[in-house]
Amino acid sequence: MKAIFVLKGWWRTS
């Protein structure tokens, strides 16, 4: 479930 972490990090950075 690494995609979830990456997506959350990207969304927060955006």
Curated annotation (Swiss-Prot):
Q: Can you cite a GO biological process for this protein?
A: regulation of L-tryptophan metabolic process
Q: Name one Pfam family in it.
A: Leader_Trp
InterPro entries in the record = Leader_Trp_op
- Residue ranges annotated as transmembrane are none
Tell me which UniProt keywords the record has, alphabetically: Amino-acid biosynthesis, Aromatic amino acid biosynthesis, Leader peptide, Tryptophan biosynthesis
The answer to whether UniProt assigns keyword Metal-binding to this entry is: no
Q: What cystine linkages occur within this chain?
A: none
Q: What does this protein do?
A: This protein is involved in control of the biosynthesis of tryptophan.
Full protein name: trp operon leader peptide
Organism for this UniProt entry = Escherichia coli (strain K12)
